[in-house]
Amino acid sequence: MIYIDNRQNKIKVNEEFENKIKEIIDYALKEEKVNIDYEISVVFIDNNSIKEINKDYRNIDKATDVLSFPMLDYEEGKVFKDVYLNYEFDESDLDEGNLILGDIALSLEKAEEQSKEFGHSFLRETCYLTIHSVLHLLGYDHMEEEEKAIMRQREEEILKSFNLRR
């Protein structure tokens, strides 16, 4: 189950766009071998809102493009398919049968700015940021160069197989 809440009014959002975001989330999760019913919440916000969240949670006083709030714990260097692929979740791990993977806060305003800066479509940028955030929910990180290379490779592989290229 994917919940989308549009809390901004700077970028027009329609049902087709929301469905594309849901589709890319489903696709990325299948590519990462998430084979359990899940729940992810996505909130579309503007630069001011994401700046506040970034300051509150990361002590960084500037707007960013996307923030991820994973609900599962991962050992350093491990991702969902390493830890939970064959894991037997019990009812206490689930909410109405769904594994809560986490929340995504996406600044559509920043995504639009970056799409222009990088010379590709707004849809491609938001799909990329969504995949990036989903991978964070699944334990990927980019703090170390080796982790960053692995994460970037997975992002590009998923985008390419979903037929979205730079």
Curated annotation (Swiss-Prot):
EC assignment: 3.1.-.-
Alphabetical GO biological process terms: rRNA processing
Binding-site residues for Zn(2+), renumbered to this chain: H132, H136, H142
Keywords: Cytoplasm, Endonuclease, Hydrolase, Metal-binding, Nuclease, Ribosome biogenesis, rRNA processing, Zinc
UniProt superkingdom: Bacteria
Cofactor comment text: Binds 1 zinc ion.
A Pfam family the protein falls into: YbeY
Localization in the cell: Cytoplasm
GO molecular function: metalloendopeptidase activity; RNA endonuclease activity; zinc ion binding
Cofactor needs: Zn(2+)
A cellular component term, taken from the record's GO annotations: cytoplasm
Coiled-coil intervals: none
Record-linked InterPro entries: MetalPrtase_cat_dom_sf_prd, YbeY, YbeY_CS
Enzyme class: hydrolase
Similarity comment: family membership: Belongs to the endoribonuclease YbeY family.
Its biological purpose: Single strand-specific metallo-endoribonuclease involved in late-stage 70S ribosome quality control and in maturation of the 3' terminus of the 16S rRNA.
HAMAP family in alphabetical order: Endoribonucl_YbeY
Protein name: Endoribonuclease YbeY
Species of origin: Clostridium botulinum (strain 657 / Type Ba4)
